Structures are given as C-alpha cells and as structure tokens.
Amino acid sequence: MTRKNTTTNPWAKFHGPNLGYVIEQYDLYVTGAGSVDPELQELFEIFGAPSFQDDVVTGDNTATHFSPQNTGNIEKILKVVQLVEQIRSFGHTLAHINPMEDAANGQSLLEKAMSELSDADLKAIPAKTVWQDAPEGIHTALDVIHRLKDVYTKSLAYEFSHIQDSEERAWLHQMVESNSLRQPLSNKKRTALLKRLTAVEGFEQFLHKTFVGQKRFSIEGVDMLVPVLDEIVLEGAKNGVEDVMIGMAHRGRLSVLAHVLEKPYSHMFAEFKHAKIEGAVANSGWTGDVKYHLGREQVVSNEEVSTRVTLANNPSHLEFVNPVVEGFARAAQENRKKSGLPDQDTSKSFVILVHGDAAFPGQGIVSETLNLSRLNAYQTGGTIHVIANNAVGFTTDSYDSRSTKYSSDLAKGFDIPIVHVNADDPEACLAAANLAIQYRMLFKKDFLIDLIGYRRYGHNEMDDPAVTQPQVYKKIKNHPTVRAIYADQLQAAGVLNADEVETITQFTQEQLKSDYAQVPPADTSDATIHVKVPDVVAKGIQPIDTGVEIDSLRAINEGLLSWPEGFNVYPKVKKILERRKDALEENGKIEWALAESLAFASILQEGTPIRLTGQDSQRGTFAHRHIVLHDTDTNETYSPLHRLPNINASFSVHNSPLSEAAVVGYEYGYNVFAPETLVMWEAQYGDFSNTAQALFDQYVSAGRAKWGQKSGLVLLLPHGYEGQGPEHSSARPERFLQLAAENNWTVANLTSAAQYFHILRRQASILGTEAVRPLVLMTPKSLLRHPLTLSTASQLSEGRFQPALEQENLGMKPNKVKRLVLSTGKMAIDLAAEIESGKHEYNLDEVHVVRIEQLYPFPAEKVQSIIKRFKNLEEIIWVQEEPRNMGAWHYMAPILFELAGDKVKTGYIGRPDRSSPSGGDPFAHKAEQELIVAHALDVKYNFRQDKQEIEVYSN
C-alpha cells in the first residue's frame, strides 16, 4: 500500500473504544473480509494504519481520552478530518483572488462536508484531534475550520497538494497556517508601500497624458508587480545573493525599469521624446530596439544590503527570454577557474521570470525551460515565477487561450508550489513574495506566484479593449486603482490621514515634472538615421596564428589516452581511442574527433573554460567523440580533459534534454554572462536546429546590433547529404546565410580536421574582445572518418584557419583553366574523391576547384587572387548538394556575379528547386550526386543546351 504524506494524522490521538473501532475497520480494509465505510476507506488510503499516541491536551490543558460522549461519533471526526484536508487542497476554489470577480464558487467541493457538520458538532471536537500543530487560541474543530478558511480562502490561495516531498509540503502548510507569513507590516513599511504604488501609478499616468498614443504596455492593473519584485530582490540580498536575473516581456517593463532597476525618469522620457540626454548610458546596439525591449543592469540597495539586478534584453517573442536568463544565472553561479567541472554555488544568484497569463500555458518554450530546472547541467537552484495575470491575451479571453482552470496549472507537473494572490491586496502580495524567496533559498527549487489583476487599458495604448471585452471594461472603468484602495485602507487604520496621502501624490507628480523638464528637444539631426557598424566589427576577424607546437600536442594526446588504474573502458571504445595513439607521429593521420579534443585541451591550457552541450554530446551522435568514458563494471564516468596538466579552466560537457529552443537559449545566455567561456551547442542533427529558429533570429544573429549584447556562442550543426532523407541531411545553411550581415557571425562548412582545430582555437582567442561574434559550423557526419578530411600533426602545429582552400594538384597550368568550381563541405570532398579516384576521362587541366571553408564573411580577396591567375577563365560555377532554393546558392550568386565581372560567366550545378531538402531514396540520391560531380568536372558539358533538371545555369 502506498501511504500519502500529509500534515494531519487523524489517528494520532485516538484512544479506547474509538481507537479499537478504527483498528477493527482497518483490519477489515486490509483483509477485505468485510465492507468498510467509504469515508474510512479513503482515509486508510491517505493515512495508512492507525497507531497509538499520547492523550490529547485540549485548550484548557486537560488531558482527555476520547469517547463517544466527548468527541461525537467517529464518522463526524473523520468528516472533519476530510474537511480540513479539502480546505487545504481546494480552498483556492473559494478564494477571492480575482479583483474583477466575486469570490470563486468552489462550494461543490466544500459545502457538502460543511452541511453535514453543525457548529455544535465542531465545538465538541478538540482542535488537536484534527490539527495536531494547531496554534495557540485554536481550541475546537470549529476554530480550526474558521482559521483554515481564513488562511486558504481569502485573497491568498495556495496549491501545495501536488508537491511530492512531504517535508516541503509540511513546511509550506506550516508557513501559511502559522502567523509568521502574515505578520502585520510596520507603519513605516506600509507607508513605503503606498509611496511605491503612488510612484508606479503616477509614472504610468504621466506617460499616458504626456506621450498620447505611444505604446508603453502599461503595468496598470497589476501595479503590485513592482513591490513584489522589490521584496524578492531585497530579501534575496539579505540572504547573500549577489545577482538577481529578471526576464520579462513588455507588459509593465517600463515601470520595472524605472522603479526596480532605478532607470531615471528623465532617461525614460528622453526615449519617448527621441531626445539625447546627458548621462544616459547606451544600452543598445547600432540599430537599437524599441524602449520596452531594452534591459538594464543596476546595483540595488537599501540601508542594509545591496545586490546587482539584471533585466535581460528581450524581443516580443514571449517567453523566449526564459532560458536565456537561466543561462545568465548558471554562469553567475559557477567558478570556472579550475580544472574539472566548474564549482556551482546556487546561493550566488537566482532568477525571477515574469510571465504573461496567456503566454505561460501557450508557449512551448515555457515547459521546455521548466524541464531544465532539475537537470544537473541546467539547474540554477530554483526560479521564482510571477505570472502578471491580467486575464486577457491581447483580445483573447482566458477560455480561448488555455484548457486549464488556472494559467499556472502547467507548473503542477513540475512539482512547483503555487500561490494565487489578488493584486488589489498589497500586503497579501508581499506575503506571497516572502514565501517565494524563503522557499527558494531553503529548498533550491522553483516557486510560482500567480498575481491576478486586470489590464486597465488595451493591449497597447492605441487599442480599445471595450470592442472585444465590453462588460469587463465597464467594471474596470469604475474600479479604483490599487493605490487608491490601499490609501483608503491606511487612512481607515489611522496610519496616514488624507493630507499625508495627498502629499505623497504631489511629491511624485513634482518629481515626474522636474525630470521631464530636464529632457531636451527631440533630436532631428541626420545622424540619428545613419546606422554605423563599429569599426572593430566591420573589419571582421583579423588573421590569428592558432598553431600549437607538436610536442605539446603529443603530450596532450598521451593524456587523452590515459585513464585511472582499474577503470574499465568499453572494449569497442578502447580500440577507437588506441587508434589515435600514433596519430601525431610522422606518418600519422588526425581525424575530426581527435582534432577537436586536441583543440579543447590546448584552449583549456591557455585558460579558457569550455562548456559543450547537446543531446548526445558526451559520446557524439555519430559515436566519434567519446569525451566522457563509462566504466563497463560500475558505470562511473571519466573525462581525460579533467585530468590534463597545466589547466586552470573548467571543462563541462553535458548531454542535454530533447529540446533545442530552451537549450540554445540557455547556452546563449550562459555565454553572454560568461564571455570568457567557449560555449558550444551541438544539434543531434542540423535538421533539428530549426526548432530553435526564434533564438537564432532574435538573439544569436541580432543581439549585438539591437542591444549591444555580445556573444561568442558556437553552433555545431551536423550537415551533409548522404541519402538519409529530409530529416537527416540539412542544417539549412541558407537560413543562417540569409541572416548574415554586418559581420554578425561566422558561417563555415569545413573540409579537414585541421581546419576545425584552427577555427575552434580562433574562436577561443576572440572571446571577451570587441571582435567576438558567434560561430555557426556545418559539421560533418560521414566526413568524420573520411580519409580526405584527415590531417597531419604539422597542419595543426603550423599556420591558421584558411577561409578558402584550393584543391591540390589542380590549376597547375593556369592558361588552360577554363572553369573555376567553388563548393563547400561534403560537396567539396565528393569532388576531391572523384578527382583522386582517377576513374574519369575529364580534362582536369581545364578545371580548378576551390573549397569555400568560410561562407560568411566570404573570403572575396582570396578568391579574387585565385581568379586573377587564370587569364583564360570562361566560367565560375557554384556546385552544391542542396536544392537550388536551399544551401548557399542564393547567397553566393551575387557574390559570384561581382567576382566574375563582364567577361566571365557564372553558373550553378546542383539539384533543382525543391520543397523538401532531400529525397528519401538513397539510390536516387547516389545517382543525383554522381551526376552533379560529373557535370561539375566536365568542362565540355554545355549548360545552355542541356535542360535536365539536375542543374540550372545562370548568366
């Protein structure tokens, strides 16, 4: 039998006849020898077997043995126990948590039990019979019911029943049922809270009246979001937290910037006015972004403590900032200045994510990110989630935007405690915030606050919400603001009088007017419309020598091939590794995986930490990497990169969950916050990377131009056409090339292990500098072990990465060369294999082949210098394995036209336009590929006469 844990044990105080009766019924329940009352049967399922404990001590401190005379019959006691548990579990259904609605109608769940118990019945039952830890002043079951209904069915409502850990559940119930959570605030704090609400409301109303019609995505209706964030931040600081990371969308963002992150009002007004103001710190890139997307970093303090708060930049793609901010936090928590895995201290930082009530259940990135919360590679010691719940998504009502009762219900599946709170009850909101931060700091797990309010205006300030929600907006129009409600409460309590409240309001208004007066007129100069990329970005990555001495490489390789005594490496893996033993000797050959490990080790020895994640990254999708070894007897793991000498930087490689978007966002965020770290994400197959397309579009490619947010993230995207069908062929390089501009990233498709070695080392060398940018690599599959991609030790020890490579033994007679073939990646190796096979009749004196290793930025000078050698060149051909509407062709075509000039033709050889990236028939694939290779190398082939679908010619 499974026993469920709970904070109330109904058997704890049963004695005499009552205990005997319950035990008798339990025996019948266990043996099945007779019928048991359904209510008792349910309690046996919940609480297990009854057991003897000490006598009850009632409110008058008199020891009491239960009997039918002083406790009522057993059935009534059990009904009370059930009622207590129902209030705890379902009290939220009765709670008044929505300021736009009357108290929730949860009568069906609780009223039946209440109707079967009179006040006299409840008064006859001692409190500790049904609530073992009843606080002082609670003497009878009637007191218990009144107290618990006051706790669970007012403006705070709780959902804890789904929490699996009994210790956590007991702590949560104890916190909310004791007096500690709702201690009255001091008059000083209540006055400060009113001042904060006055500032929030005053700021929003000032914007509303001063910048009529401009979008601001007002916080009004959930104004308490600002004090809630204040409370969480400062309570975190009291616990020693150094960094608080906040992710949120545009709703309420301007008020959070102005108040939580202390962005001066004058700077906010200048952005609305399009004016330049002295002292404003640029927090955007050269193209910039709208004001409600921008982030900020600020040290926040009070008289006692301080902490750094970071509000992440984000687009309007709702919730996609979530994993980015989690990556920030993990980077802030880890010490990467030692070998082995980094040391993580989750008390150093935590995340607050502000969600929308429609977006939280609606966007899949939310559940992807929640799934990271307990994983070793991604957990950050607990995130505090706040749903800024205004009960509408643009024009869509909640009944059209989710299939659950609450917008927060998704969180139940991740074992997250949930508090619903009425946003018109300020002190209840602060209580929820306090519970959240205490739980997070104690249990290192997520917590969710559902802050339920309303939206005073439309989705934006030019929108009329009454068109689609006429009834609710009649209510909202006449509904007082939370500031007004709280001001009335403080006046009624004698904390402030009307004049003092008015003084607070006037002070806020004067401050706003004064700050607005500091803003100069709008800047209408031409300079504001001319976008200039910083010179260091425009120049691109300058040549960097990345070779490593052979002796150092040999020492590294020796270390990579050693493991602790008694560690039993899987025999097949051991053979793979042992083949690498002589790879750096005179006649040795270095394959892709070894080149990668050598690059990693040398980068670590130079003090650069490395983090690599992906769905199979420890072994490698194609069983090539084996960077983490598993003992065949114990399943213990060992990574040689953790034990190499002369390393003072961490190395972590993790298998990720089956998610692309959240993991890419997380790694991007980690890299932004730890710019000195080589952070790499590897797709299982490049084909699957497009499920993270929003992250590539909004963050990785454009983050620096929009927000000045630098990243050196590396994307490893397995790519290559091998007859494996449309889901295992293409990383869709065309999409990355379409996004390529302003030297925003490097896109490469390499053909040798040495090139991979050098480009990784080059990327590591630019981390933390102004020259840094992401690196998008189309990585190989079949080429991982292809003999034509192997490299020698000298190719690693000398030189640097080459953006373009010429095919060896071609172009030896420059005056005879008529065709220059350009290709990249696996296509270039297929051409090389055909050339070296000798099984052809082409006149190769008339052909030269160049491999474009770096697609973007295109190595124009290098290719131009090659073209100049061939005085009789007639055509430049781009050859690719992808369909014409995919791959690099549409990116390459204008480049080739410019390179060719007026006298040289340009052309394309490859598959025709197709809707699917690849066919599914391996035999058809092979035939097509052979035809592409043959036509590319055969100068006699006349494009303009042959209309076969396999190639298209462009003049």
From Swiss-Prot:
The family database entries (SUPFAM superfamilies) matched by this protein are listed as: Thiamin diphosphate-binding fold (THDP-binding) (SSF52518)
Question: Looking at the keywords, is Acyltransferase present?
Answer: no
What UniProt keywords are attached to this protein's entry? Glycolysis, Oxidoreductase, Thiamine pyrophosphate
Catalytic class of the enzyme: oxidoreductase
Q: Which Pfam families match?
A: E1_dh, OxoGdeHyase_C, Transket_pyr
Is-annotated flag, keyword NAD?
no
Name what cofactor the protein needs.
Answer: thiamine diphosphate
Q: Which InterPro entries match?
A: 2oxoglutarate_DH_E1, 2oxoglutarate_DH_E1_bac, DH_E1, KGD_C_sf, ODO-1/KGD_C, THDP-binding, Transketolase-like_Pyr-bd
Give the E.C. number(s): 1.2.4.2
Catalytic activity annotated for this protein?
A: N(6)-[(R)-lipoyl]-L-lysyl-[protein] + 2-oxoglutarate + H(+) = N(6)-[(R)-S(8)-succinyldihydrolipoyl]-L-lysyl-[protein] + CO2
Quote a single Gene Ontology cellular component term.
Answer: cytosol
Task: Please indicate which superkingdom the organism of origin belongs to.
Answer: Bacteria
The Gene Ontology biological process terms listed for this entry are:
glycolytic process; tricarboxylic acid cycle
Query: What molecular functions are annotated in GO for this chain?
Result: oxoglutarate dehydrogenase (succinyl-transferring) activity; thiamine pyrophosphate binding
Q: Which family does it belong to?
A: Belongs to the alpha-ketoglutarate dehydrogenase family.
Q: What does this protein do?
A: E1 component of the 2-oxoglutarate dehydrogenase (OGDH) complex which catalyzes the decarboxylation of 2-oxoglutarate, the first step in the conversion of 2-oxoglutarate to succinyl-CoA and CO(2).
Task: Give the multimer and partner information.
Answer: Homodimer. Part of the 2-oxoglutarate dehydrogenase (OGDH) complex composed of E1 (2-oxoglutarate dehydrogenase), E2 (dihydrolipoamide succinyltransferase) and E3 (dihydrolipoamide dehydrogenase); the complex contains multiple copies of the three enzymatic components (E1, E2 and E3).
Fetch the PANTHER family from UniProt.
2-OXOADIPATE DEHYDROGENASE COMPLEX COMPONENT E1, 2-OXOGLUTARATE DEHYDROGENASE
Q: Which HAMAP family match?
A: SucA_OdhA (MF_01169)
Q: What is this protein called?
A: 2-oxoglutarate dehydrogenase E1 component
